[in-house]
Amino acid sequence: MKKIANYLLIEKTDDRYTISMTPELQDDIGTIGYAEFTDNDHLAVDDIILNLEASKTVMSVLSPLAGAVVERNEAATLTPTLLNSEKAEENWIVVLTDVDQAAFDALEDA
């Protein structure tokens, strides 16, 4: 099941929620040249997940859900352009667990 919030895609697989950028956001910000994850192991709604610099903007990516961070796309810190990829296995940002199912269900369907 996929949901969308803040130009981010959230895909639920079992109890894991993978957050990635929508193609619209990727297009709007341009080529990403720098990406830095925050060290938070638990996120609240609107906490910063990732700071990035792209050809069209500098921005912070905010979490659409609260949950525990179990994985970060650390490869994106070495190769930030991975976040521009069309491939889901390359462009993901973080994986969360311990997410409130009702909060996920309340998001817009993708």
Swiss-Prot record:
Repeat in keyword set: no
Impact noted for substituting residue 11 to A: No effect on ADP-ribosylation
Effect of mutating residue 28 to A: No effect on ADP-ribosylation
PTM comment text: Is lipoylated on K-56 by LplA2 (SpyM50870) and then mono-ADP-ribosylated on D-27 by SirTM (SpyM50869). The mono-ADP-ribosylation state of GcvH-L might regulate the availability of the lipoyl moiety for redox reactions; ADP-ribosylation would inhibit the interaction of the oxidoreductase with GcvH-L when it is not required, thus ADP-ribosylation of GcvH-L might be acting to keep the response 'off' under non-stress conditions.
Function noted in UniProt: May act as a carrier protein for the ROS scavenging lipoyl moiety and/or as a substrate for oxidoreductases such as SpyM50865 and SpyM50866.
Effect of residue 56 to R: Loss of lipoylation
Gene3D superfamilies: 2.40.50.100
Annotated Lipoyl-binding domain residues: 16-97
Quaternary structure, from the entry: Lipoylated GcvH-L directly interacts with SpyM50868, which reverses the SirTM-mediated mono-ADP-ribosylation of GcvH-L, and with the oxidoreductase SpyM50865.
Residues modified as N6-lipoyllysine: 56
Protein species of origin: Streptococcus pyogenes serotype M5 (strain Manfredo)
UniProt cross-references to InterPro entries, sorted A to Z: 2-oxoA_DH_lipoyl-BS, GCV_H/Fam206, Single_hybrid_motif
CDD domains linked to this entry: GCS_H (cd06848)
ADP-ribosyl aspartic acid: residues bearing it: 27
Name of the protein: Glycine cleavage system H-like protein
UniProt keyword annotations, A-Z: ADP-ribosylation, Lipoyl
Effect of residue 47 to A: No effect on ADP-ribosylation
